[in-house]
Amino acid sequence: MRIIVSDKIESVCPEFVGAHVEIYVHNSPYSAGLWGEIDRLGQEFRQTLTTETLKDISGIAATRQVYRACGKDPSRYRPAAEALIRRILQGKQLYQINTLVDLVNLASIRYGYSIGGFDADKFEGDTLTLGVGRAGEPYEGIGRGTINIEGLPVYRDAVGGVGTPTSDNERTKIDDNTTHLVVLINGYDGCEADAPMPSTFSSWRATTATVPTEATIFINKVKLWNRILTAAWHRCASG
């Protein structure tokens, strides 16, 4: 899978750095261990965060800033990581979908980064381009219907949008039959200290029998993900 970062994203977020991980998987309906970790994090968040202070989490704050730079109101179109944590702080349970989706959600709330998971066999073409949504661009968010993605960062394949930090697209969503997974990790803050993935990857292998096949860096400023993904890959392989 080839990933391109557009000039527009480079101009509004010169520090952007991200990663693409491609894995063959065996999905499952539910993982008790995974939900134990989600519940543990929920308890921690309720003790340490409010719906205002969660906006200061580095990955969330940076994503909100990119929204503003692109002309989108981040309080109306919240990044998914922020929306998920807000739901927890409001005393609500996260939706249980399947192990892969639940794991991506866990990574998102744990680190605050925009992390998208996709069924790679549903992509059209072999290239994804990260750009900015256009006026009137069609986009169906998962479980949300039509979303106005004008001003949102968006990944597009050969047909159209597949993922934004607010919602991924119905067309390429993970389902119970997904066996070819692509994960896109987006560091709009470029902050190495808070970077996700090594512990998440080891849990991932345990819960979904993953076999990592490719991990690449897509960046406009090289500074973050190579060491992290190499370590994650080796941990998965050694199991």
Regions found by a protein language model. Give the residues of each.
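Charge-biased, low-complexity intrinsically disordered regions
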Residues: M1-L229
